[in-house]
């Protein structure tokens, strides 16, 4: 057994150890977002050093102060937390993750906190993605307060 944090233990079998398994057990209410989701969808070729997690702004802050795995929480209004939520699979584990359209809205929202190269590549790959949904993107942009920016930045490419 390995102690992850006070009250959190994990059995170690080198064959079935997965960092994503640890993250989803520690933070079952969290949603993968930003750099982690960009990597999942292939919009970024960089592997993030931290797990980027969206959580309710009402959730406790201290639970994210752990030594491993490295996590970067994004505190989101509860009203829009589950907007664009979908599920996926990573390393054999079911994950909660934002869909591509919500992800791009978040990138626009946090563009000043992101690496510019990652931001630009994410936008370009989204535009080239045949599975993108511009109506859904615009639907999410309203409640996330990035509608004008979405029209200005994404509209140029269409």
Question: What are the residue ranges of the model-derived segments?
Answer:
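Nucleic-acid-binding surface
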Residues: 3, 8-158
């Amino acid at each position: 057994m390995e102690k992850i944090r006070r009250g959190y233990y994990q059995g170690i079998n080198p064959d079935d150890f997965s960092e994503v398994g640890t993250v989803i057990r520690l933070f079952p209410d969290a949603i993968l977002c930003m750099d982690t989701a960009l990597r999942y969808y292939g919009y970024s070729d960089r592997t993030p050093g931290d797990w980027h997690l969206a959580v309710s702004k009402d959730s406790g802050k201290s639970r994210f102060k752990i030594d491993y795995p490295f996590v970067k929480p994004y505190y989101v209004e509860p009203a829009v937390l589950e907007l664009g939520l979908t599920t996926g699979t990573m390393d054999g584990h079911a994950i909660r993750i934002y869909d591509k359209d919500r992800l791009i809205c978040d990138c626009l929202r946090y563009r000043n906190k992101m690496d510019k190269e990652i931001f630009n590549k994410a936008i370009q790959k989204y535009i080239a993605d045949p599975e993108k949904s511009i109506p859904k993107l615009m639907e999410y942009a309203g409640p996330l307060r990035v509608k004008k920016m979405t029209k200005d930045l994404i509209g140029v490419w269409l």
